[in-house]
Amino acid sequence: MKTGYFNSSVIKPLVKASAQHAAFVTGDIVFDWTGFEIPRGTAKLLGATIKIRSKGDSGSTVQPAGVNLLFAKGPVPDATPTSLGTANGEVTNFASTDIIGAMPSAAADSFGLRTLYQSTVSSSELVLEPNGNSGANIGVDKFYVAGLAAGALDFRSAVTVDGTPGTGQANLDVEDLDPDLFMVVGDVVHDEDDRLMGTISVFTDANNVVMAANLANAGVNDKLIYNINPIEIILHFQK
């Protein structure tokens, strides 16, 4: 039988701004179950490329560790597994029967000034076997991935809202740090209270971030802002 290889689409899990507002410690939940689809049928997970943004400080401090991945399938097709617990806290639901495997981070495989991790699966060779009829479309199966801190991850931001920019404008006035040091066009920005500001369209300068549309919520002076997708994952499979 012919062997095939393929990659998942880019997975951008939600890392809540309120969870990024404090540093993580080893074992903390970085992001809860996030769904992804792959071509229908059983597949072997060979590895993952995990891109992790730097800390939001003046030095763009590189993250000192990676993320351990857990995999699950829903209790019934297309049903999200039970939450692992509160983000930036310990797992409280390790007993879930939905979990089907794990892939530890390989810290020695890290490289790049913005921290790019290339991790390989353990010798157990994780195989993802789907529920029947999962996935939103014919020909695909749905699984879920969650991430636990493999060390002292720290996404804390030093960028604050300047004044009280209103919802009648697309410009978010900021101060204290140039957001361009750790944010990019296309990032979805929330404030520290998990209030949506918008999706970045352009950086006019170090104090002005223009969103793709008017601000979703009015800014609150001195509130810190965060990119809610500081981690991107591409999974590598064999069929």
Segments from the language model and where they lie:
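A short beta-strand element within beta-rich, extracytoplasmic domains
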Residues: 43-55
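C-terminal interaction-tip segments
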Residues: 1-21, 133-159, 226-239
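Short edge-strand/loop segments of extracellular domains
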Residues: 66-80
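Extracellular and analogous surface-interaction loops
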Residues: 31-42, 131-136, 175-179
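Short coil-to-beta strand junction motifs in C2/discoidin
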Residues: 60-67, 228-230
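Extended, solvent-exposed segments with strong compositional bias
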Residues: 89-135
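Autoprocessing Asn-cyclization modules and mimics
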Residues: 156-222, 226
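Extended, low-complexity, turn-rich repeat/linker tracts enriched in Gly/Pro/Ser/Thr and Asp/Glu
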Residues: 52-63, 151-156
